Regions:
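Basic, polyanion-binding surface patches
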Residues: 1-154
Length: 154
């Protein structure tokens, strides 16, 4: 199947917008907007994330390290845009969106799912990361930022 046909078909798959965040062993902070995040199992609670091998967060997501899946609210498009742009990479943590006291997380996200990396697998251009959920927190009402067809949904 040609890559272009697959890309067109995937534009019809609506999904919530998530930012993956982590801190490596030397204290450097990383964040990226992720399009491939899904729950994996409920017993034990686990989540699956796919990260391009070229992403700067890639090397921070190793077995035993912590990460956070930040599911964004509708008013957090700016955070998504900053965390998806190579040009804005240096600005990702230069704002008050974050709590960086431990595993970095977005303070007012729709939900924060904290994980410890349990397994990673290489698959062509990506690393598949399985996170064992340690705890989570979420907003009281549903206001999730959604994305499809190359843009944010109302």
């Amino acid at each position: 199947m040609p890559k272009e046909q697959f890309l067109i078909a995937m534009r019809f798959l609506a999904s919530s917008v998530s930012v993956i965040s982590a801190k490596n062993s030397s204290g450097s902070l990383f964040a990226m907007t992720a399009s491939s995040v899904t729950s994996l199992t409920m017993d034990p609670p686990s989540i699956l994330v796919c990260v391009n091998n070229g992403a700067t967060i890639h090397d921070a997501l190793t077995k035993g390290e912590n990460l956070c899946i930040n599911i964004l609210q509708k008013n957090q498009q700016e955070i998504s845009n900053i965390c998806s742009s190579k040009e804005l990479e240096s600005q990702r943590f230069q704002n008050d969106f974050w709590d960086v006291s431990d595993t970095p997380f977005i303070k007012d996200a729709q939900a924060n799912i904290f994980c410890k990396v349990d397994e990673t697998f290489a698959y062509h251009t990506h690393k598949i990361v399985i996170g064992s959920v340690t705890h989570s927190q979420s907003a009281d009402t549903f206001n999730t930022l959604m994305y499809a067809d190359g843009g944010y949904l109302d």
